[in-house]
Amino acid sequence: DGVAEQNFRLRSEGVDIEGVVVESTLDGNYVKRDGILKGETISFAGLCKMACCNLAESFENSASVTVGYSDAISGARQIKMLGLAGTYTQILDENRPIMRGLSAPYGLSYTPGMWLNSIQVSKGVSSVTAGHEAITGQINLEHRKPTDDERLFVNLYFDDELKPELNLSTALPVTRDKKLTTIVLAHGSMDTKSYDHNHDGFRDLPEARAMHVANRWLYAADNGLQLRWGFKVTAENRLGGRMGYENSMRDQMR
């Protein structure tokens, strides 16, 4: 091709390097084009840019997913993809189907945003490997892993109405050989104020107190065998509707 032949000689002189670490920073939102399915990925850097407290608020800068309130009294939210309601969209937790049945209306608020490493969004009909619900698309959530190097992560957040939220994550090896690792995720929020900015006599948002705790374990053997297990506990109390309603009937029944 018009380039003269060049010969290079390698000599074992100089300094030996045991390893090289290459670090880079991903964009907040990017489209993955090297796979079979074209999809949008929201990285952890993108989640940090948004004041997202839960999964529903993680799609504020996403052009693929829109989130709206399906019930103003209870604060339930639903997603829309390709113009259809969220019942036609499959939500996966590390490729496992979640948010089915009774958890569907409130499942978007049961996953804190700071628990996630990334979110993958693919539009259109997807594979039925994980279920048949993916008609308009799939949303896969990647949580923080037990093998993360970050031993402790603490996040305290206040919104414009001074609603406090606390997120905690700690990952640590249980054994010295790091074959058995675990991670504890905790989230707490409290919104005890009532707001009626349009003065219609109804709360704009429900009063809510929530606590979420998750514990995940990973055992990775030398022969490639991996075992994963864990649990998640959710406790929540919501109060919506008229401004003057204070659960008087419930208190009388106790």
Feature locations, PLM:
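Flexible loop and strand-edge segments within Gram-negative outer membrane beta-barrel domains
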Residues: 191-212, 220-254
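Short strand-turn segments of transmembrane beta-barrel domains in outer membranes
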Residues: 118-128, 138, 142-173, 206
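Short acidic/polar hinge/loop motifs at secondary-structure boundaries
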Residues: 78-80, 96-123, 213
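Outer-membrane beta-barrel strand-turn architecture
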Residues: 145, 174-178, 219-225
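Transmembrane beta-barrel strands of outer-membrane/channel proteins
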Residues: 154-158, 184-190, 229-235
